[in-house]
Amino acid sequence: MKLSAQRLFAIARKEAMQLRRDPRSLAMGFIVPAAMILFFGYVISFDVKDIKLGVLDQDLTPRSRELVEAFQGSGWFRVTERLTRDAEVAPLLDRARVRMVVTIPSGFQAELAAGRPAPVQALVDGADANTASIALNYANSIVLAYSARAALGMQDIRPPIVVQGRVWYNETLTSSNMIVPGLIAIVMMVIAAQLTALTIAREWERGTMEQLAATPVHSAEVVLGKLLPYLVIGLIDMLAVVLIGMFVFGVPLRGNPVLLFAMATLFLIGSLGLGIWISAAIKSQLLATQTAMQATFLPSNMLSGFMYDIGNMPILLQAISHAVPARYFINVTRGIFLKGVGIPVLWAQGLAMIAFATIGLTLAVRSFRKEIE
C-alpha cells in the first residue's frame, strides 16, 4: 500500500484530539519537562563553596589569626565554629556541623619566627569524597600561599614564575553551564519516550486496536500519524527548556539555534519511535511508561557522560555507552551552547542522530505491524 499524506494527517488529527482529552499526557508534555529542568538544574551542582569550617586556634597569636583570616577571606570557606579544645572536634564532624576542622597548634608563630616548619592539621569529613578532595585542595592552596608570604616576611613579592591560566567555554567554571545542556538531552529523551509509550497501549486498553487494525492504512502511516503530535509537543518543550537554560540559569547559547533544533528533531523522532516500539510490545499503559522510564532515564543518566566521565569508566561500559543515544545529543547541546561549534565539528553526532531516528522509526513500524497482524 502506498503511503498517503492525507491518511497520515487524519491519524495525526485523531491522536491530537485524544491527546487534548488526556490531562495526564498534557501535563507530562507541557509541565513536566520545564519542572524537571528547574528542579534538577537547581539541585545538581558540582560547585563547592562556602564550606563550613571549624577552627581550633591553640596559638592565639597575630600569625595564627592571619592564617584563619586567609581561610575566611578565600571565598571557599566560611568559619562557622571556633573551638577551644581537641575534644570538640569529633562531635562537630560526626554531626556534620562542619566539613573541615583546621587546628593551629601552640607555638605556631614561634616556629615561623625561628624559620622552622610550623605544622597545621586539617581534618576533613570524607563521607562525601568529592567535597572532601576539593576542600583539601583549597586548604593546601591557602596554606601554600600563606607559607610563601611568611617565608618572604609577609611581603607581597612577585614569584619568578606565574601560571596564567585561562578557561575556555565555561570561563567562570559554573557547574550549571555544564549540567543544563546535558539535562536538556536527558529530559527530552525521557519525556518523548514516556509520551508515545502510552499511545499504542492506550488503544489496547480501550479496545480500539482491532478497529485500527481493520482500517485500510499502512502501518507506517499509523506510526507517523501518532508520532507527529508528540513531535510538535517535543519541539515546544525543547524551546521552553532552552529558554529556561538561557534566562533562568544563564547558560550562553553561542552556536546556531537552527542546528540545535534540527539535531533535536532527529533525536526526538528516535525517542518517540522508541516509545511506540515499547508501547506496541507492552499492552499496559502503566507497564509501558515504567519500561520507557527504565529504558531511557538510567542509561541516559549513567552512561551518556552527563554525570560521569565516560573515559573513567571500565572498558566494557565505555563500549556500551556508544549505544546510548543521549551520549551523542549531549555532545551536541554542550557543543552548540558552550563552544558555538557547527557541522564541521558535530557531523559525527549528526550521523548518530540520523541513525537513531531511522532505527527508532523502523522498530516502531515493524513492532506495530507485527502486533496488528
For the regions a language model picked out, list residue spans one by one.
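Extracytoplasmic/periplasmic domains immediately adjacent to an N-terminal transmembrane anchor
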Residues: 1-177, 345
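Alpha-helical transmembrane segments of multi-pass membrane transport proteins
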Residues: 5, 60, 185-189, 233, ...
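Transmembrane helix boundary and interhelical loop/hinge segments in multi-pass membrane proteins
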Residues: 19, 96, 193-217, 227, ...
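Short coil/turn motifs that cap or connect alpha-helices
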Residues: 22, 218-219, 342
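Short hydrophobic alpha-helical segments within the ABC transporter permease transmembrane module
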Residues: 27, 31, 208-209, 222-232, ...
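Membrane-spanning alpha-helical segments of multipass transporters and channels
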Residues: 39, 60, 81, 91, ...
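Long, hydrophobic alpha-helical segments
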Residues: 44, 179-197
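Selective transmembrane-helix segments that form parts of the transport pathway or gating/packing helices
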Residues: 219-244, 261, 265, 350, ...
